[in-house]
Design a protein with these regions (language model features):
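Rossmann-fold NAD(P)-binding glycine/threonine-rich loop
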Residues: 272-288, 490-509
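A glycine-/small-residue-rich N-terminal strand-loop-strand element
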Residues: 78-89, 96-122, 635
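Conserved small/polar residues in nucleotide/adenosyl-binding loops
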Residues: 628-635
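Predominantly a Rossmann-like dinucleotide-binding segment in NAD(P)-dependent oxidoreductases
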Residues: 299-317, 517-587, 592
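Mid-domain Rossmann-like dinucleotide-binding core that forms the NAD(H)/NADP(H) cofactor-binding site
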Residues: 123, 146-224
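Beta-loop-alpha module in the N-terminal Rossmann-like domain of NAD(P)-dependent dehydrogenases
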Residues: 245-254, 447-501
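N-terminal Rossmann-like dinucleotide-binding module
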Residues: 379-441
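Short N-terminal strand-loop motif that marks the start
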Residues: 1-92, 335, 369-384, 634
Length: 637
């Protein structure tokens, strides 16, 4: 199937043939009919990507800081690889679309094949022929819904959340600063709710368009003389009950202007990307104004449990989640309480998406909403995609399931480039990643399904996915009679471990876990010097903090840091003393999120050795990450 992508390094935009998306649990696969270009968010992303490296650095100072931090922690080589990986990658674009359901995943009950739906979410609702989207980022549409209008789903939900943050009542007034897509959508939602809407924009054309299409009650060009007094008069001398800033600018004018036109104890809601360093006097302090932010589509946004796992918030306690915001927006469209049609000033066939984005970047003519239309008659290919002319097979023929940052930095570059090793297939959740990795590392194809990887060509499978899928992929690979290399941990559940042991004994195939530290040259020297005599050992890891909402900390997906990472150090101590553990005890310090990732572990071994693993998530960044000592060693590592 085809997908629009952009390379961050050069800004090049390409419609690529990429693998058909995988259907995960709690997800649906949708054939797109329309997708909408966010001329603000996507426009700035595309524009920044086309700048020089210096221009990119100026545009994204926070990412420059991340690079510097990585350099301090991991050194120049790993930092260079990480930066180049990012710059060389083709990233998907798009986050708002509509279409019809063509497949339904496990556990999905609210959608069936053939349903009309609207979808949201960067990385999900892409500009692509086919998308795979979690259920809480999709809404079912009325059978009579206009799919072009419905494709404004994400933008509508963002505007809706801004309106909800303003918390206005019938008869109250609101000034909207910025009459682009978000501003005009928010204005229509407010008008449908009985609120008097006053629109302000730096573009007279935007103001005129909003007035002509009845999106606002009154409109003003920002440079209109005496604009503050005019708004005071309209609001009977009080000022607006709320101001919604839907502009995108580096100027402080919107936030200070909002203070000037809001009433005493009024609200200012920031919906767009603007700085908030307002002047305290003469308005903000004396009026005791309330500044509120609108977080994207609404409650549930950026929450892994809500968006990826599909765990809803109870309606009596969280009335308007991001999904319910989308549903409310779609209801306003289908009941004709708001008018979306006039917002679409340009429509391009998907094949001409480059021209659409060139219009956004160059601004060669006025535009508001830009829709991409898809060929829904053509059936997208589900076949694997060839990425190399070579079909050579070696003694060892490798395929990868999962090829994210770790695999690209620490596994794939070190596969021997000899005739004994054949590079067969790549399978990842992201079609763009599969394609790029397969091409970069000279694999024969990128896959669309597991069976492509577990075919007769492959005899060795590398598994580098998220931790929760390790166990099942190891088991499937063994049952397909493959040797397996799996990144740590091998699995998360004891039941999975038992099944793997049973299957390995049955097939006799090799299963290797990525405990790479035992193979380092220095470790080999230490091992040779110390032998297998009983010893006391200390392994201190200054691991650093990982946020509680990171997938690694999720007990179901990452398993937590003890299962996910500390297993590595237990293996190291086991290797160093040449004996297996017989007793383990641990003690963690309390933390607010019950992560238990700052702890001491005491391990006793069969040969009488003992080891302490001191794993600290709260250590100083200035301290070395790793320290290994032993009474049998002369030096520290």
């Amino acid at each position: 199937m085809q997908q629009l992508t952009q390379k961050l390094g050069s800004g090049e935009m390409v419609i690529q043939e990429v693998p058909y998306p995988q259907l995960g649990k709690g997800m649906i696969i949708v054939k797109n009919h329309y997708s909408i270009i966010s001329t603000g968010t996507e426009g700035s992303t595309v524009t920044a990507a086309r700048k020089s490296l210096l221009g990119k650095a100026k545009e994204r100072p926070q990412q420059v800081k991340q690079v510097i931090d990585t350099l301090k922690k991991q050194g120049p080589i790993q930092t260079y690889r990480a930066v180049m990986k990012k710059l060389d990658a083709y990233s998907p674009l798009g986050y708002s679309c509509s279409g019809e359901v063509v497949e339904v995943g496990e556990g999905v009950t609210e959608f069936v094949v053939g349903d009309k739906v609207a979808c949201a979410g960067a990385g999900y609702a892409n500009h692509a022929e086919i998308v795979s989207v979690p259920v809480n980022l999709c809404v079912k549409l009325n059978i009579e819904a206009n799919l072009k209008d419905a494709a404004y789903n994400t933008l509508g939900a963002i505007s809706m959340q801004g309106v909800r943050q303003a918390d206005l009542r019938i008869g109250e007034s609101c000034v909207i600063i910025g009459l682009g897509l978000l501003g005009q959508l928010a204005a229509q939602i407010l008008k449908a709710s009985g609120v008097t809407v006053i629109g302000v924009d730096v573009s007279e054309a935007a103001v005129n368009k909003s007035v002509e299409n009845n999106s606002i009650d009154l409109g003003f060009f920002r440079d209109t003389d005496g604009i503050e007094n005019k708004i005071q008069n309209i609001t009977k001398g009080h000022g607006a009950d709320a101001v919604i800033i839907a502009a995108a600018t580096n100027s402080l004018d919107p936030i200070n202007f909002a203070g000037a036109v809001a009433r005493k104890k009024g609200k200012v809601v920031v919906l767009g990307a603007v700085p908030t360093g307002f002047q305290r006097d003469p308005f903000w302090y004396k009026k005791e104004l309330e500044l509120k932010m609108a977080c994207s589509y609404g409650p549930g946004r950026y929450d892994l449990n809500y968006e990826e796992k599909g765990i809803d918030y109870p309606l009596p306690y969280v009335r308007w989640t991001e999904k319910r915001n989308m549903e409310a927006f779609q209801n306003l469209i289908v009941t004709k309480k708001i008018n979306i049609g006039y917002l679409t000033t340009h429509e391009f066939e998907f094949e001409n998406a480059n021209a659409a984005f060139n219009l956004v970047v160059s601004r060669s003519e006025p535009f508001t909403g830009i829709a991409l239309k898809y060929n829904t008659v053509k059936a997208p290919s589900k076949s694997k995609i060839s990425t190399s002319k070579s079909e050579n097979l070696g003694k060892i023929n490798i395929s990868f399931i999962g090829a994210g940052s770790y695999a690209q930095g620490n596994l794939l570059p070190y596969i021997p480039k000899t005739s004994d090793v054949g590079r067969i297939g790549i399978l990842t959740n992201s079609g763009t990643t599969s394609k790029r990795v397969s091409e970069k590392f000279n694999f024969q194809f990128c896959a669309t399904k597991e069976n492509d990887i577990l075919d007769d060509k492959t005899n060795t499978v590398f598994i580098a996915t998220r931790h929760d899928s390790h166990g099942s992929y190891v088991l499937k690979s063994l049952k397909a009679n493959k040797n397996v290399f799996v990144e740590k941990p091998m699995c998360l559940l004891e039941s999975e471990l038992n099944d793997i042991i049973k299957e390995q004994k049955k097939t006799g195939k090799t299963v290797m876990v990525g405990f790479n530290r035992r193979f380092s040259p220095l470790t080999k020297k230490l091992k040779k010097a110390m032998g297998n005599n009983p010893m006391t050992m200390l392994y201190r890891i200054n691991a650093g903090a990982i946020p509680s909402n990171n997938w690694i900390q999720d007990s179901e997906i990452g398993g937590g840091r003890v299962i996910g990472e500390v297993c590595h150090f237990i293996d190291y101590l086991t290797f160093m003393n040449g004996s297996i553990p017989i007793k383990i005890s641990a003690s963690a310090i309390p933390d607010a999120y019950n992560l238990n990732d700052t702890l001491n572990i005491l391990v006793q071994f069969k040969n009488g050795s003992s080891g302490v693993i001191a794993y600290y998530a709260n250590g100083s960044k200035s301290m070395a990450c790793l320290l290994y000592t032993s009474d049998a060693a002369d030096d520290r590592v």
